[in-house]
Regions:
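Gram-negative outer-membrane beta-barrel transporters
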Residues: 299-300, 313-316, 368, 372-375, ...
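N-terminal periplasmic accessory domains that precede
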Residues: 45-47, 91, 103-126, 134, ...
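C-terminal beta-signal and adjacent terminal beta-strands/loops
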Residues: 482, 529, 582-587, 608-663
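Transmembrane beta-barrel wall of Gram-negative outer-membrane proteins
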Residues: 121-123, 128-161, 165-208, 232-234, ...
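Membrane-embedded beta-barrel scaffold of Gram-negative outer-membrane proteins
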Residues: 239-266, 412, 418-424, 450-513, ...
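Short acidic/polar hinge/loop motifs at secondary-structure boundaries
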Residues: 56-57, 64-95
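Structural signature of Gram-negative outer-membrane beta-barrels, strongest in the C-terminal barrel
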Residues: 188-193, 202, 298, 310-312, ...
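Surface-exposed extracellular loop regions of Gram-negative outer-membrane beta-barrel proteins
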Residues: 205-218, 321-325, 385-387, 410-458, ...
Length: 663
């Protein structure tokens, strides 16, 4: 990390292979100041340093946190982040966008899958465990027989579990199961000495029923019409590289086609649980999302610090198009036995289409003032144009342009230590609000919201101490948010849980500041320790329409997040690992003041290796801690429908066995 001039956490292959549950949602606990919002089966949205979307209901699909897999943008679709056969995961904290085509206000999550190799190799893995867990994965690749210049890697994976919940009404334990498949083919072709091509074809299929929420907050659901949280994404990507005398030309092209179903039993119950009242509501959204991305980069050769070459640079242009269609079907019935005119029935169907074109120009230059001091300058200009229309007659076509950039100074103190300082300006595009009954040319300030801008200041230190027995990385940051985008929701009809209205506004400003500390320590030849700590303080300021939130912390921004762990090599074949991860309390929303409770989860793993085989016995949340990852505040109980806090709880104790074969 000695050349980095920003806060970045890298999770390597060794760590990712050792994790029994192959999904980024589970691994995210290891990254300080990274949180997620799990409203449905899988977490789709992440927050870095307290900034990021928490849901995708009736909102322009903009993402403050970028999410890339193999340079392909899946922002706002984090549920597809399966992590089998992964080379590394990078979490970049703070504004990004001057080195790559994708833009990110709060930070960027980048997943790099395994590349084809010159020699044949592979991995096979089987996992079985409690709650119906059965996972199987196989990945292999190498050179194609007829050509050494053509290599491939094929990855196949399926993950199954019953979802940790039981539906007491139906007597089933699979109404929130997970059935997730990953298929990926990568082909590398060295066409000429200086020209190469990379091809990617993948499909990620999440066939996950969604029966999550309960009236009493338990893991026992009562729904008579469980919903779905399914997603199937087909991806096609092509990268072309050509080396010139002093720089490399890169072309990155991709297409994604995603089908999503988000449906749920909105009353969370059944005729028996609501008796004597009739209270039965269901909502279904069918979404089709297509993206097209084309990016060109020119990347200089690495500077060699001779008098004629003290710089390295990248410049690029990126085009990103997204088209999204939604069909929403809601139905329901409400009846009070004391009302002679009831029950009352409702049914609605609507459709909408959204498209957006984003064109950006970006660049970064590193200038080496001397062998130990590097100055970096980066800039990004982006223009977006979007169109929206729905069956209610609402239509919008907002557009805007935004400018961001970064300046940093990196000083190498010794062969094993460096310090850096950076100032970066990032942005997130604006949008519009629906169902306000306003014309597109209305001057009402609630109709549109503006882009948000964030200026981030960081100072950091990376160092290796005690003959490299200890690695430490520390970052102090301060972020100033201008025109902060804040989402609030209200329920129009208290007897109909399908009548929520969502409103995004620009608060005048907000601040996010804190500390991130990573320590790796080799205590003895057989004992390793790691500690990762995130401290965060956030505020909402000068929001004229919500003066009651003045100075309050932002939603999903815990003050403390941490991961502590120790690994003991008992023998050359056996090892034992124990880690503790946790978060302090945080506000669930900007619409109300309810908070989660702080929690800590302990995980244990025993590993034994024989030749190319590795066997693991593992347990997650070994003390069966009851903790919450999402909360809603509204009324969902007839007949009074009093507002109360409903919480979605995380996974209970989970035990299993994994066998892995490396070949």
């Amino acid at each position: 990390m000695l050349e980095e001039s920003s806060s970045i956490v890298i999770l390597n292959t060794k760590l990712l292979k050792s994790e029994p549950i192959k999904h980024f949602e589970n691994i995210s606990y290891l990254v300080p100041n990274l949180n997620f919002a799990a409203s449905d089966s899988r977490a789709r949205h992440f927050q870095i340093r307290g900034i990021g979307e928490r849901s995708g209901y009736e909102r322009t699909p903009n993402s403050a946190v970028g999410f890339l897999i193999d340079d392909i943008d899946y922002s706002g679709q984090g549920g597809i982040a399966t992590t089998f056969d992964i080379e590394q995961i990078e979490v970049h904290r703070g504004p990004q966008g001057s080195r790559i085509g994708s833009n990110a206000l709060a930070g960027l999550i980048y997943i790099k899958t395994k590349e084809p190799t010159k020699q044949f190799e592979g991995i096979g893995e089987l996992t079985t465990g409690t709650f119906g867990t059965f996972n199987a994965g196989l990945a292999f690749g190498g050179p194609v027989g007829f050509s050494e210049n053509l290599t491939y890697r094929l990855t196949l994976r399926n993950d199954n579990t019953d979802g940790f919940r039981k539906n007491l009404y139906s007597g089933k334990s699979d109404t929130s199961k997970k059935d997730e498949s990953t298929y990926r083919l990568k082909i590398d072709w060295e066409i000429l000495e200086k020209t190469s091509l990379k091809l990617l074809i993948s499909q990620i299929d999440l066939n996950d029923p969604a029966d999550i929420w309960t009236i009493d907050g338990s893991l026992n659901t009562l729904s008579d019409r469980p919903g779905m949280d399914s997603q199937k994404t087909n991806t096609y990507g092509v990268k072309v590289f050509h080396q010139f005398d002093a720089f490399e030309f890169q072309s990155l092209s991709s297409i994604t086609d995603t089908d999503i179903e988000i449906s749920y039993d909105a009353d969370w119950g059944n005729p028996e649980s609501h008796a004597p009242y009739i209270y039965d509501y269901f909502s279904e959204t069918i979404r089709d999302r297509k993206t097209l991305s084309q990016e060109f980069r020119l990347v200089s050769d690495i500077a060699n610090l001779n008098p004629q070459n003290k710089t390295k640079w990248v410049i690029g242009i990126s085009y990103f198009n997204v088209k999204e269609r939604n069909i929403k079907n809601d139905d329901g019935a409400y009846g009070d036995p004391s009302d002679p005119f009831g029950p009352y029935f409702s049914q609605s169907s609507s459709s909408s289409k959204f498209s957006s074109d984003n064109l950006s120009i970006f660049g970064n230059i590193d200038y080496f003032l001397d062998e130990s001091l590097k100055l970096s300058l980066g800039a990004r200009w982006e223009n977006y144009e979007s169109q929206y229309a729905d069956s209610f007659g609402e239509s919008f076509n907002p557009s805007d342009y935004m400018l961001g950039g970064k300046i940093s100074l990196n000083k190498i103190l010794s062969h094993s230590s460096n310090i850096f300082f950076s100032v970066a300006r990032g942005f997130n595009q604006g949008g519009f609000n629906l169902n306000l009954g306003l014309a597109p040319d209305s001057k009402n300030s609630n109709l549109y919201y503006d882009p948000e801008f964030l200026t981030n200041y960081e100072i950091g230190l990376n160092s290796q101490l005690f003959n490299e027995m200890m690695n430490i990385a520390a970052v102090i940051f301060y972020s100033d948010r201008k025109d902060q985008q804040v989402l609030i929701s209200t329920q129009v009809d208290p007897t109909d849980p399908n009548t929520f209205s969502f409103l995004t506004q620009n608060a005048a400003e907000g601040t996010n500041k804190g500390l991130e500390l990573n320590v790796n320590l080799k205590l003895t030849e057989s004992l390793d320790f790691f500690s990762r700590l995130g401290l965060l303080k956030t505020e909402i300021n000068n929001w004229k329409s919500r003066p009651d939130l003045e100075g309050r912390a932002q939603a999903h921004a815990p003050k403390r997040s941490y991961a502590l762990g120790v690994s003991w090599s008992i023998t050359d074949k056996a090892s034992l690992s124990l880690d503790l991860v946790g978060k302090s309390s945080f506000y669930y929303s900007d619409s109300h003041d309810n908070q989660s409770k702080s929690y800590a989860l302990a995980n244990l793993s025993y590993n034994y290796s024989i030749g190319d085989w590795t066997y693991s016995v593992w347990a997650r949340n070994i003390f069966d801690k009851y903790y919450s990852v999402r909360g809603f505040y509204f009324g969902n109980e007839a007949p009074d429908f009093k507002d109360k806090l409903y919480e979605r709880h995380g996974d209970p104790r989970h035990i299993g066995i994994t066998a892995r074969y490396d070949f």
